[in-house]
Amino acid sequence: MDVSQPRIQIQVHTKYVEEQSNPELARYIFAYIITIKNHSSESVQLLSRRWLITDANGKQISVEGDGVVGQQPFIDAGDEYTYSSGTALDTPVGVMQGQYIMHDAQGKEFVVEIEPFRLAVPNILN
């Protein structure tokens, strides 16, 4: 499996979901929207994902599974795929990072690294 990224770009936007959170019970809910852009010259398919979620206490949760939100999408050359999901933390701040396992039009698997991104209650950090 190749660890290079054949021109796949990941964009992440996060949001604290206040109406589903309960700070008194140490339950902080975050939504994230991810856009996967295929800047390569061929179609790719997202096969699986791996996430490492770390809260402010250093507690780590590892999540692995097929596809994203029940799908293993094909992303055509020059196209993009956007989905939203969420996670719960015990603290008002945390970090997510991970990988997508994908394959190209020839069936060659490769890994797309998802750089760490912050989950934080608004105005909690300076």
Swiss-Prot record:
Domain of life: Bacteria
GO BP annotation list: error-free translesion synthesis
Gene3D superfamilies, sorted: ApaG domain (2.60.40.1470)
SUPFAM superfamilies membership: ApaG-like
Domain ApaG: 2-126
InterPro entries for the chain: ApaG_domain, ApaG_sf, Uncharacterised_ApaG
Alphabetized PANTHER family for the sequence: F-BOX ONLY PROTEIN 3, POLYMERASE DELTA-INTERACTING PROTEIN 2
HAMAP family for this protein: ApaG
The protein's name: Protein ApaG
UniProt organism field: Vibrio vulnificus (strain YJ016)
